[in-house]
């Protein structure tokens, strides 16, 4: 942070302390020369950095510009307390999670250990049937007859061991497959294995004419983590030696997985096979051997920290609209990326290291000077060690020479700058904008941080909110008890939110040094009249207060609301800033903000049908989903901020008309990392940055509301100058996918901004214009966007709300692609 910014921040924090002192009572007697770190006061006040109403009533400690609850007497050890021989805490902690909206909540089992269902894990017995029995128990959503369900969540846990399987493991909808994080178990494919993949997330129905268990674009809420998958017993020439069939959509993750495959010359093995979908995030993956590390086709995906060793082809891209790869290591592969062009529309690769690989990137077609012929490609900070060709065509033509060197910034596609509506096709070096040092690790790469799993901690380092009195039954008001638990145990214990639906009717404050862990996406939801007034919005979950610093880690949680009218709900206000010495120290992983469309929200098809007959008042889902405030930092990985467009429960298909005002608003001075995030269907905007600085965003994905422009944005919300950009002048405005105002140091590396409907009709797709404009950057901002894909937006980028770049100049299959745009 520049000195001027830092001084301003400290002054404003000091002013805040003055406000607190004037609003409350300073009960201590303090000498004028007393160090600030030693001042303690009791304060009652109503203060929020957003201006929204937030009740603060707690004893606080003022410590080096921090306002925080009194520290616990026994802080959580920084490096954990578990001995190497201790079991992974998840295996032995008390499991009392529930699914309160299940027809039989008292008997439904959320957590299930595969060994309780007969799995042996000795590498000899066939455990496939036992594992699938553990997955299926409880009348869960699978088999092809259930399009989706949130009322049968499950964690299927694998203790350490080797699990031999002769048939596929099929994770049903809303399933987390979790292995022992201390000693990841091995899933070993039998020599006779002949199914599609060892783990199949969307099976084809036998004799079903190509039908599958779930619609791929709606195959939400899945996670697989902590496994070694070994297919080397399967004959090398059999493609059934595939680790994971991963045809999925948003709110899905793969993490901490190693796949071992044959390295024979005739190998047909694959690490991941993915033919369709709309993802998604995956990270911390290693693929050894095989014909393909990843064989992939999907609208969009974010991949972080991927290593592929000794594969014939590291990544085979059969089609996409836009993928972002961050932190890629390719070693001893014949081809790093094999892109089937032009149907692979856009590939963006940052912080890659490629070693002893003849071809880093190969396109199947030559560009011949046009985007449409070979798609868009962006490389940023790619280090080559003994690489024959950096970019080549399948016919042998070398586009960019290899060697041992670093490619700072290079691209293939249409490049634009500022307000100039005329782009140029480039196949060469691109301007390489500087990135804020706060966004980078010690080696100059964008920071990436693995999903915390606390494998070095014992079960006794955790407390259960249900043990401490919270109900999570979807009915009881848990506001008071959750505030008490968080106040008491932040920094002392890891707080385990047993599976359930926790209702709060007032602000819940999440203090610095809170580590909170959900179970199969525990739901925390705001409800009631305090969140009903959009003229006076109120925070539901407040993560830190303005000027507070500290560790915050939130994993496997869903923040939500309960209708009928929560038009004033700011669902999450993020004020916390990471400690200076801990990059990405304040973040969320595999946690989402989801409103409407599921059991328990009162915002389903029965309440808010697509035709709008229920009216606005009954169908407000929130005012603003996520507000990252000025003094905050944030690391968000795999976070989906989704206003439901259809029911996930009920028939799983019916479209609904529910209304959320705004998606993600950031005013942060940084650092902020938005890695593999999405924001969809909010009335005014999906992403907005205002007076912000030092953001890395890649990949971001949006969809505009299906009902717009009937009514047009911002209806049914009133224009609010404190939270909203000025509406653009159009006869029927729709929501901004992205709006950036008075911001600097904004680095967007992969964006998919989509508009699929116009007043619930898709006829506009044919004309490629379901809305007039979709991304706006003002002239006061410094922004660089790489690999922007849009769907059916007339103007892809606007400057000061005036459309500049017409999509027709950048048609790239179904999408239109801008390879690079810089504001200056």
Task: Describe the function of each predicted region.
Residues 2-155, 168-170, 182-243, 247-255, ...:
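Extracellular "leader-to-stem" segments immediately downstream of a signal peptide or signal-anchor
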Residues 113, 157-159, 176-178, 496-498, ...:
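Beta-strand cores of modular interaction/reader domains in eukaryotic scaffold and signaling proteins
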Residues 160-162, 174, 499-500, 507, ...:
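Tight coil/turn sites that cap or link beta-strands
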Residues 167, 175, 289-291, 299-315, ...:
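Internal alpha-helical scaffold/solenoid segments in large eukaryotic proteins
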Residues 167-168, 172-180, 504-522, 685-686, ...:
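Classical protein tyrosine phosphatase
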Residues 319, 341, 365, 499, ...:
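Active-site proximal loops enriched in glycine and acidic residues that flank catalytic Cys/His/Asp
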Residues 484, 488-489, 494-507, 660-689, ...:
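C-terminal, well-structured subdomains that either form a transmembrane helix-short loop-helix hairpin
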């Amino acid at each position: 942070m520049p000195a001027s910014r830092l001084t301003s921040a400290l002054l404003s924090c000091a002013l805040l302390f003055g406000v607190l002192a004037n609003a409350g009572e300073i009960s201590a007697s303090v000498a004028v020369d007393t160090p600030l770190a030693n001042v303690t006061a009791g304060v009652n006040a109503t203060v929020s950095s957003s201006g929204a109403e937030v009740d603060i009533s707690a004893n606080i400690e003022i410590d080096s510009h921090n306002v925080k609850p009194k520290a616990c007497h026994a802080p959580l050890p920084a490096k954990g307390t578990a001995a190497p021989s201790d079991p992974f805490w998840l295996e032995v902690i008390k499991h009392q999670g529930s699914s309160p909206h299940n027809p039989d909540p008292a008997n439904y089992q959320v957590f299930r250990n595969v060994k309780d269902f007969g799995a042996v894990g000795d590498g000899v017995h066939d455990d496939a049937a036992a594992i699938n029995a553990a997955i299926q128990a409880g009348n869960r959503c699978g088999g092809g007859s259930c399009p989706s369900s949130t009322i049968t969540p499950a964690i299927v846990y694998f203790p350490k061991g080797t699990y031999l399987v002769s048939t596929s493991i099929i994770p049903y909808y809303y399933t987390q497959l979790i292995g022992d994080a201390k000693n990841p178990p091995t899933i070993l494919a039998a020599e006779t294995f002949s199914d599609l993949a060892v783990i199949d997330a969307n099976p084809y129905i036998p004799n079903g004419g190509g039908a599958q268990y779930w619609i791929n674009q709606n195959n939400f809420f899945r996670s697989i983590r902590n496994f070694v998958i070994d297919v080397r017993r399967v004959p090398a020439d059999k493609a059934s030696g595939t680790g994971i069939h991963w045809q999925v959509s948003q709110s899905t993750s793969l993490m901490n997985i190693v796949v071992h495959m044959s390295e024979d010359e005739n190998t047909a093995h694959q690490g991941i096979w993915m033919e369709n979908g709309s993802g998604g995030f995956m990270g911390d993956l290693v693929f050894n051997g095989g014909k393909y590390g990843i064989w992939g086709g999907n609208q969009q995906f974010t991949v972080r920290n991927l290593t592929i060793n000794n594969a014939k082809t590291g990544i085979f891209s059969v089609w996409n609209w836009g993928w972002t790869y961050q932190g890629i290591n390719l070693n001893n592969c014949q081809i790093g990326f094999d892109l089937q062009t032009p149907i692979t529309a856009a590939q963006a690769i940052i912080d890659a290291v490629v070693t002893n690989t003849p071809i880093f990137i190969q396109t199947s077609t030559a560009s011949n000077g046009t985007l449409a012929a070979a798609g868009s490609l962006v490389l940023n900070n790619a280090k080559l060690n003994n690489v024959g060709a950096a970019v080549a065509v399948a016919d042998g033509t070398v586009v960019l020479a290899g060697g041992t060197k670093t490619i700072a910034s290079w691209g293939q596609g249409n490049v634009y700058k500022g307000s100039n509506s005329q782009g140029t096709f480039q196949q060469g070096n691109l301007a390489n904008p500087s990135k804020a040092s706060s966004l980078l690790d010690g080696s100059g790469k964008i920071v990436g941080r693995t999903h915390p799993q606390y494998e070095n901690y014992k079960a006794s380092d955790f407390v259960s909110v249900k043990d401490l009195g919270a109900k999570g039954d979807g009915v009881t008001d848990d506001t008071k008890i959750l505030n008490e638990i968080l106040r008491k145990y932040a920094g002392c214990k890891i707080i385990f939110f047993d599976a359930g639906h926790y209702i709060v009717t007032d602000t819940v404050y999440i203090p610095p040094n809170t580590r909170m862990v959900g179970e199969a996406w525990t739901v925390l939801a705001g409800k009631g009249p305090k969140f009903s007034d959009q003229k006076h919005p109120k925070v539901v979950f407040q993560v830190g207060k303005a000027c507070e610093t500290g560790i915050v880690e939130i994993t496997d949680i869903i923040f939500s609301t309960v209708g009928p009218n929560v038009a004033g709900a700011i669902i999450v206000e993020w004020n916390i800033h990471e400690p200076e010495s801990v990059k990405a120290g304040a973040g969320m992983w595999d946690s989402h903000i989801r409103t409407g469309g599921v059991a328990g929200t009162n915002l389903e098809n029965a309440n808010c049908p697509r035709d709008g007959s229920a009216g606005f008042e009954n169908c407000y889902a929130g005012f603003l989903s996520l507000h990252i405030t000025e003094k905050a930092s944030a690391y968000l990985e795999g976070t989906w901020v989704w206003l439901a467009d259809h029911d996930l429960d009920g028939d799983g298909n019916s479209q609904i008309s529910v209304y959320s005002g705004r998606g993600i608003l950031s005013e942060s001075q940084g650092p902020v990392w938005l890695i593999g995030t999405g924001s969809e269907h909010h009335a005014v905007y999906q992403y907005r940055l205002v007076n912000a600085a030092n953001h890395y965003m890649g990949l971001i994905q949006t969809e505009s509301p299906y009902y717009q422009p009937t009514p047009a944005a911002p209806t049914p919300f009133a224009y609010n100058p404190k939270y909203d950009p000025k509406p653009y002048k159009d006869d029927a405005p729709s929501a901004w996918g992205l709006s950036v105002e008075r911001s600097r140091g904004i680095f967007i590396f992969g964006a998919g901004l989509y508009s699929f409907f116009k007043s619930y009709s898709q006829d506009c797709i044919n004309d490629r214009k379901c809305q007039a404009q979709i991304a706006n950057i003002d002239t006061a901002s410094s922004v660089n966007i790489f690999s922007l894909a849009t769907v059916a937006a007339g103007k892809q980028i606007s400057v000061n709300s005036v459309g500049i770049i017409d999509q027709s100049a950048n048609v790239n299959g179904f999408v239109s692609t801008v390879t690079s745009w810089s504001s200056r």
